[in-house]
Amino acid sequence: MKRFTRAYSSATTTLGAAPIPASKIKYIPSTGTYPKGFVASGVFVGVKPGNTSKPDLAIISSDRPCAAAGVFTKNKFQAAPVTFSRKLLQQKKNAGLRSVVINSGNANAVTGTGGLEDATNMARTTDQRVGDEDSTLVMSTGVIGQRLPIQKIVDHIPMAYHKAGDSHSHWLNCAKAICTTDTFPKLMSRTFELPSSPGVEYRIAGLTKGAGMIAPNMATLLTVLATDAPIAPAVMPNVLRHAVDRSFNAITIDGDSSTNDTVALLANGAAGGKEIASEQSPDFEAFQGLLTEFSADLAKYIVRDGEGATKFVTIRVVDSATEEAARQVARSIATSPLVKTALYGKDANWGRILCAAGYALISPPGQPINDVPEIVPERTNVSFVPTDGSTELKLLVDGEPEQVNEERASEILAMEDLEIVVRLGTGDKSAVHWTCDFSHDYVTINGDYRT
């Protein structure tokens, strides 16, 4: 499948009143190619007290019905918009959706029946503008346990819909509007082709937010993916789940899982061509690969914007007996506070990596002790791999510690991007997880969050 990409740079330098860090501006696109039939907007409402300028209400809408799918939080205290949107997709059988409305600054979580009424009110107000009943998904992000200023929000939905457009600036404003502690808006778009429709240019766009409460099973993470490719409602859930498991469920900032996680995919078919209706078709395989790669690239932006983070770290577990074992080991290492603080301190304390790998697969307290045949200490290898192409630094070889060159280790750990590779030596399966370090700023940001 032919794919087209674009360069990244931007004149955008602020997010609301806050300056975007110079090191993050390179991740903001200056142009984009957006899916046909979709429009987007981001407007200022003032949902969170103290916000006086940053857009905090977003709408993405299609000029025709879409096939749609969603992947949601597994947190038992799921937020009202999650409950509403999950039920709507089930009711509509993943068909006939037209729009997504999103507010930032308030999560509308743990807000009782009133919170569900507020989410419904947001959807119904948007439906009236779109002209279709039961056609709007709802997302919210922000502080938990407080009711939305719902009248203020619904009063601004008509304006948000009226201001929606298909230009790059419209999509960028939309991406800005869903941010909370993010330091930069996260937006991507690409064009691609499918095997059965050579010469037809399809487009996909995605925007996401998240900088804290990020862990597997998603976290305070909202994502909307939109494409003009023709995809049947029946195959939407599986193609999205496959992509999410290998992208948004493979990132960690702090190990906390939020009440509001939502990743939604909308496909309106506006570009034409043959509908992807079978999971056995070459088109399905091609789109699944494209969506997974696209989602992974978008998810990496969240890690790069981790609260207080100074490093982007890839945890790669290879030569595993099973893919699931590799995932669990990678996740355990990526989530370990001891590993993450050592990375911040440029400390080559590989014992912490081994420790996190060693407890990844053991049974929980109160359960029979399992043997964990997937991990054999005398077959395990650990290395630091620099991203500049230079030679990897071996820390552990077949269970035996290496004489580590501390100066070389410090050079690698000083890099903004680095990779930790764990070879289990028990099979041929692998998994990857993306994470960041823990710095002093993480505590400062989260200590001040409600203020």
From Swiss-Prot:
PANTHER family: ARGININE BIOSYNTHESIS BIFUNCTIONAL PROTEIN ARGJ, ARGININE BIOSYNTHESIS BIFUNCTIONAL PROTEIN ARGJ, MITOCHONDRIAL
Family: Belongs to the ArgJ family.
Oligomer and partners: Heterodimer of an alpha and a beta chain.
Site (Involved in the stabilization of negative charge on the oxyanion by the formation of the oxyanion hole): T141, G142
Residues annotated to bind substrate: T180, K209, T220, E307, N446, T451
NCBIfam families with a match to the protein in the record: ArgJ (TIGR00120), PRK05388.1 (NF003802)
A GO biological process held by the record: L-arginine biosynthetic process
Enzyme class: transferase
Residues annotated as site: Cleavage: A219, T220
Function: Catalyzes two activities which are involved in the cyclic version of arginine biosynthesis: the synthesis of acetylglutamate from glutamate and acetyl-CoA, and of ornithine by transacetylation between acetylornithine and glutamate.
Keywords for this protein: Acyltransferase, Amino-acid biosynthesis, Arginine biosynthesis, Autocatalytic cleavage, Mitochondrion, Multifunctional enzyme, Transferase
GO cellular component: mitochondrial matrix
Pathway field: Amino-acid biosynthesis; L-arginine biosynthesis; L-ornithine and N-acetyl-L-glutamate from L-glutamate and N(2)-acetyl-L-ornithine (cyclic): step 1/1; Amino-acid biosynthesis; L-arginine biosynthesis; N(2)-acetyl-L-ornithine from L-glutamate: step 1/4
Cellular compartments annotated: Mitochondrion matrix
Positions annotated as active site in the UniProt record: T220
EC code(s) of this entry: 2.3.1.35, 2.3.1.1
A GO molecular function held by the record: L-glutamate N-acetyltransferase activity
Protein's UniProt name: Arginine biosynthesis bifunctional protein ArgJ, mitochondrial
Reactions catalysed according to its record: N(2)-acetyl-L-ornithine + L-glutamate = N-acetyl-L-glutamate + L-ornithine; L-glutamate + acetyl-CoA = N-acetyl-L-glutamate + CoA + H(+)
More info: This protein may be expected to contain an N-terminal transit peptide but none has been predicted.
Source species: Fusarium vanettenii (strain ATCC MYA-4622 / CBS 123669 / FGSC 9596 / NRRL 45880 / 77-13-4) (Fusarium solani subsp. pisi)
